[in-house]
Amino acid sequence: MRNLSILLFLIFSNLSAFAQDTLVLPIKPVVKDANYAGGNTEDLYYYVNNNFNYNNVKKEDIPKTAKKKPYFVFYVVFAVSEDGKAFEFSPKEISAENSFYKEAVRVIASTRWNVATKDNEYKKQFMVIPIKANIGDF
């Protein structure tokens, strides 16, 4: 009887040990970045370049550091809203009052974006777009 109870104890203790061997993996959130709805980055630059109206900019707004160069670069920072529109614009390396910046904001505001999501919920994401303004003809 003693041998039988020891044998049963060993069998049942091994079964409970097997039940504890479950693998628990941490859940990683699914994050999707915002992107231009009109295609890839090249398509975005093509759109900005073709829709940037140099009639809306002033020659005196060309930065002094770029006077003898054929172009200058500045950056437009913005967020993508829940409905895929660009908003909350801010300039980098240029004044917010500069006509080149204002024209770039006008063009970027006319674009549509696929929104950023985290676990299929809207996530506000900021984008930085470099703008190369060709000033060789001014």
Residues of each region from the PLM?
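Charge-biased low-complexity segments
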Residues: S5-I6, A17-F138
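Hydrophobic helical h-region of N-terminal Sec-dependent signal peptides
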Residues: R2-L10
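N-terminal signal peptide c-region/cleavage motif recognized by signal peptidases
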Residues: F12-S16
